[in-house]
Amino acid sequence: MTFTVIIPARFASSRLPGKPLADINGKPMVVHVMERAQESGAQRVIVATDHPDVEVAVRQAGGEVCLTRADHNSGTERLAEVIERYGFTDDDIIVNVQGDEPLIPSVIIRQVAENLAASKAGMATLAVPIETSEEAFNPNAVKVVTDAEGYALYFSRATIPWDRERFAQSKETIGDHFLRHIGIYAYRAGFVRRYVTWAPSQLEQIELLEQLRVLWYGEKIHVAVAKAVPSVGVDTPEDLARVRQVMAGQ
């Protein structure tokens, strides 16, 4: 099995301007992500960015980069542009790794690609067990429920499945059946081509979860429990400070 990693790295960020170039121990954040992807055994790693400064930083680090349009509404649309420009075949496996995940374990990048290759779905992703009630009831922690074969039934910011008997007594403890979705995806390139032709779905717009578009149009998403739990991504200056501290100790 071979696969390509594409790393969407949008320059603008309301909470952390210029985020892909944020310095972490002497390297831009996007370069750390690129190196993690290279460690996964990917045949090819491409950074997809809308800003020439990011392009320069990636090239200086010896990486491959595609300068994309700046008007994409999502990372998936940016991914689709790269797929078309590079001429990937419909069966090629593409892994989408977020450009703000400098601590992502390389093992799960390979895992999601292997899971897609072994499944009948056009798309695969990962999840980790939820262990605290705080996380189970946190709308920023996206929950997922699956069928018996590991295909997603639904993703939600709500607490799903609702443990009726337990929660009628107390919401301070939870069972072992909650899963938190991790935002890493593998796709077949042909699936991405279809995806970007679909109009946004009602559920997607209500929950603000792009992956619900896939379920809305009757497609399957394979979900597996991740072999390693990724650390915090970088959305805020506080996140950046924490990641710098963690990486300084490695």
Swiss-Prot record:
Subcellular location: Cytoplasm
Designated name of the protein: 3-deoxy-manno-octulosonate cytidylyltransferase
Record-annotated disulphide pairs: none
Keyword Transmembrane: no
EC number per UniProt: 2.7.7.38
A molecular function GO annotation: 3-deoxy-manno-octulosonate cytidylyltransferase activity
UniProt key word Iron: no
UniProt record, GO biological process: CMP-keto-3-deoxy-D-manno-octulosonic acid biosynthetic process; lipopolysaccharide biosynthetic process
Keywords: Cytoplasm, Lipopolysaccharide biosynthesis, Nucleotidyltransferase, Transferase
Family, as annotated: Belongs to the KdsB family.
Organism the protein comes from: Pectobacterium atrosepticum (strain SCRI 1043 / ATCC BAA-672) (Erwinia carotovora subsp. atroseptica)
A Pfam family: CTP_transf_3
One GO location term (cellular component): cytosol
Substrates-to-products reaction catalysed: 3-deoxy-alpha-D-manno-oct-2-ulosonate + CTP = CMP-3-deoxy-beta-D-manno-octulosonate + diphosphate
Pathway given in the UniProt record: Nucleotide-sugar biosynthesis; CMP-3-deoxy-D-manno-octulosonate biosynthesis; CMP-3-deoxy-D-manno-octulosonate from 3-deoxy-D-manno-octulosonate and CTP: step 1/1; Bacterial outer membrane biogenesis; lipopolysaccharide biosynthesis
Lineage top rank: taxon: Bacteria
Function recorded in the entry: Activates KDO (a required 8-carbon sugar) for incorporation into bacterial lipopolysaccharide in Gram-negative bacteria.
Gene3D superfamilies reported for this sequence: Spore Coat Polysaccharide Biosynthesis Protein SpsA, Chain A
